[in-house]
Amino acid sequence: MKNEMLALILAGGQGTRLGKLTQSIAKPAVQFGGRYRIIDFALSNCANSGIHNVGVVTQYQPLALNNHIGNGSSWGLDGINSGVSILQPYSASEGNRWFEGTSHAIYQNIDYIDSVNPEYVLILSGDHIYKMDYDDMLQSHKDNNASLTVAVLDVPLKEASRFGIMNTDANNRIVEFEEKPAQPKSTKASMGIYIFDWQRLRNMLVAAEKSKVGMSDFGKNVIPNYLESGESVYAYEFSGYWKDVGTIESLWEANMEYISPENALDSRNRQWKIYSRNLISPPNFLGANAHVEDSLVVDGCFVDGTVKHSILSTGAQVREGAEVLDSVIMSGAIIGQGAKIKRAIIGEGAIISDGVEIDGTDEVQVVGYNEVVGVATDED
């Protein structure tokens, strides 16, 4: 049976710009917003868009990510005719199959894709925060009779040189692609979201592999190849909230935007929920000295200090006399008595000992997973 569209989430990047936060886990597994991991947004978008088959392409430090996704039940992707498949590099008779780039990762999983037998493939990045109806993008792809549709976001001209820029005609057909141009001709930035006709993409990838032509990356190789070949390539304009959280600063900003009164992500929209694998935790406990304002405090937290404009993830502790301001405290982290945290991201299971001060006024500070800052006490 032919499935209409298969989603493939690229989740194998190392995420070196997130520093300590990705030393032991893949970037899409990094926590966000108190109860989510970054990949939850792509998975939830798939579920809400009616996509029933999803492949997650992993490579770097996949254990936490694999455990989080499980069988896909948290996103309703564990039915008879639906499912999530974890796609990791493996050795084959022809040798090593380590992924060399985004499109190469797709080529290496041709057998899996063929087994699903889709008419279209949706390529997604696993490290962006946004809500999108992929079905609407697919309809645009069909209406344009396109071979490839690229989701684009209008960005300020001064920021356009940071992105792959799509130059289009009056009908939104892409006529030129520029990778991080010094002097951009337009402000339509690629979001790294693509819909391909599968057979056309498959034929191109197989031919490139046979001829040993480098075709490892969608932005650098595949899109230019499609344009040079005269394929019909169109832009799909997206106007909602979208954030690339590939740096410490952008991850911190996205978390702060998430708890802002405006909340452009519209996290409380019951018509488009963000799902996650949530463990059962006890209720929060607020001690006699607790003072919490303008903050998001998730299940299982213990607070006996001051928390302002911050996020406390599942099971975090802020002990007596501690102060947390403009910060993200990830699951299980402990902020000791009298400690002061400002503009920081504290990783899962980290311990900030009594009296320690972390000040990110000039630059957002990061404490890694299970890292101990200061001298931990027996209580920790």
Swiss-Prot record:
Listed Pfam families: Hexapep_GlmU, NTP_transferase
Transferase listed as a keyword: yes
Q: Where are the transmembrane segments?
A: none
Instruction: Copy the pathway line from the protein's UniProt record.
Output: Glycan biosynthesis; glycogen biosynthesis
Cleaved signal peptide residues? none
Output the Gene Ontology terms for molecular function: ATP binding; glucose-1-phosphate adenylyltransferase activity
Enzyme Commission identifier(s): 2.7.7.27
Enzyme class name: transferase
UniProt keyword Nucleotide-binding, yes or no: yes
Identify the residues that bind alpha-D-glucose 1-phosphate: G164, E179, K180, S190
Q: Which Gene3D superfamilies match?
A: Hexapeptide repeat proteins, Spore Coat Polysaccharide Biosynthesis Protein SpsA, Chain A
Offer one example of a GO biological process linked to this entry.
glycogen biosynthetic process
Q: Which reaction is this enzyme known to catalyze?
A: alpha-D-glucose 1-phosphate + ATP + H(+) = ADP-alpha-D-glucose + diphosphate
Q: Which UniProt keywords apply?
A: ATP-binding, Carbohydrate metabolism, Glycogen biosynthesis, Glycogen metabolism, Nucleotide-binding, Nucleotidyltransferase, Transferase
Task: Give the matching InterPro entries.
Answer: ADP-Glc_PPase, ADP_Glu_pyroP_CS, GlgC_bac, GlmU/GlgC-like_hexapep, NTP_transferase_dom, Nucleotide-diphossugar_trans, Trimer_LpxA-like_sf
Q: What family is it from? A: Belongs to the bacterial/plant glucose-1-phosphate adenylyltransferase family.
Q: Name the NCBIfam families on file.
A: glgC (TIGR02091), PRK05293.1 (NF003670)
Subunit structure, as described in the record = Homotetramer.
Job of this protein: Involved in the biosynthesis of ADP-glucose, a building block required for the elongation reactions to produce glycogen. Catalyzes the reaction between ATP and alpha-D-glucose 1-phosphate (G1P) to produce pyrophosphate and ADP-Glc.
List, alphabetically, the PANTHER family matched.
GLUCOSE-1-PHOSPHATE ADENYLYLTRANSFERASE (PTHR43523:SF2), GLUCOSE-1-PHOSPHATE ADENYLYLTRANSFERASE-RELATED (PTHR43523)
This protein is called: Glucose-1-phosphate adenylyltransferase
Give the source species. Streptococcus pneumoniae serotype 4 (strain ATCC BAA-334 / TIGR4)
Q: Which gene encodes it?
A: glgC
